[in-house]
């Protein structure tokens, strides 16, 4: 059987990885490195046999190496170079006109759902249905399910996934040393009920943890690539936003560590918990964020509902007056959230302590210790009149750096291309 699998892999262009790269692929999450280390820990595909270790350099090879979502065989996948997910089976680039349903027309869509005539109802009818079909066409190419017991790592210093959305519904997944760019939705949906003025919403995150457990995302970089939303037009007075989140978690996702990642030039970075009404998330969404860098991120770094989230030694930098990505807040205190924040650093000129966070309906508590704002120690919880009692104290973590050392440590170490 192993010989057959290896022969199949070679036929598809999947090559066994070299010894040097394999060192990274066989690494597992440390025994106390955040919530991802809880119970069984996160080992990914570290137990893969040699016939289930692949190097891939295009979408076809990646999809083949992953196999079906039910493929729980341990596997290690090394990404070499850039993988563009917006391609057909012949690796021909695909764009708006390739995915677009014949009935979909943006001008007709804008006319049909103009708030001055359509009002605050959710869009329905011919153009919304055509938009949804168009989006479904794109989804079939760019969204891939990551099965259980999988490690995906970048080979060398320049591994990239462009235009893709990795979705994790499974258990025991490791993703490291990859730059994720431009999870671009060609067909944003107008939602007149989102906020007081409505908003354009997109479908794809770089990584979506949809009920997945025991996940480690480490030393990755996330950005909008060559198509930042800052260059998009406005319709109905709102930005026509083509990107959603960078690393989102919902629907019972649990036991996750996100470490040494570099998030930059983006609006909504990470939301943990999709809805206030999803009370089944209470007791789940246990996530650790440490040594991550957030540069020119507007909001959600992270925004939390329900979860016990340990946020320590992260570095935030931005400007409230930026014309492209104006800083709004770092931590979103949502319904029944339980963020435990330690020794984080925020450099946003002119920002007040109260504005470092945003408090949403049902958010009542935040533990905050050691936060430096523009060089001065603050307490964001006290500045917003929140309780400091979140009902838990983290025990799964490594040494916590002094706040004075966070900026240099994170800048020097966070992001893809720094492990090799």
UniProtKB/Swiss-Prot annotation:
One Gene Ontology cellular component:
extracellular region
Name the Gene Ontology molecular function terms of this record. Answer: metal ion binding; pectate lyase activity
Keywords for the protein's UniProt record, in alphabetical order: Calcium, Lyase, Metal-binding, Secreted, Signal
Fetch the SMART domains from UniProt. Answer: Amb_all
Induction per UniProt is: Negatively regulated by TnrA under nitrogen-limited conditions.
Q: How does activity depend on temperature?
A: Optimum temperature is 42 degrees Celsius.
Q: Where is this region: Disordered?
A: 117-139
Q: Pfam families annotated for this entry? A: Pectate_lyase_4 (PF00544)
Residues the record marks as active site: 300
Activity sensitivity to pH = Optimum pH is 8.4.
The record's cofactor note says: Binds 1 Ca(2+) ion per subunit.
Q: Where in or outside the cell? A: Secreted
SUPFAM superfamilies recorded for this chain?
A: Pectin lyase-like
**Signal sequence interval, chain numbering:** 1-21
Task: Write down the Gene3D superfamilies for this protein, in alphabetical order.
Answer: Single-stranded right-handed beta-helix, Pectin lyase-like
What does this protein need as cofactor? Ca(2+)
Q: What is its EC number?
A: 4.2.2.2
GO biological process, alphabetically ordered: pectin catabolic process
Family in the record: Belongs to the polysaccharide lyase 1 family.
UniProt subunit comment: Monomer.
- What job does this protein perform? Produces unsaturated products from polygalacturonate.
The name of this protein is Pectate lyase
According to its UniProt entry, this protein's organism is: Bacillus subtilis (strain 168)
Q: Which gene encodes it?
A: pel
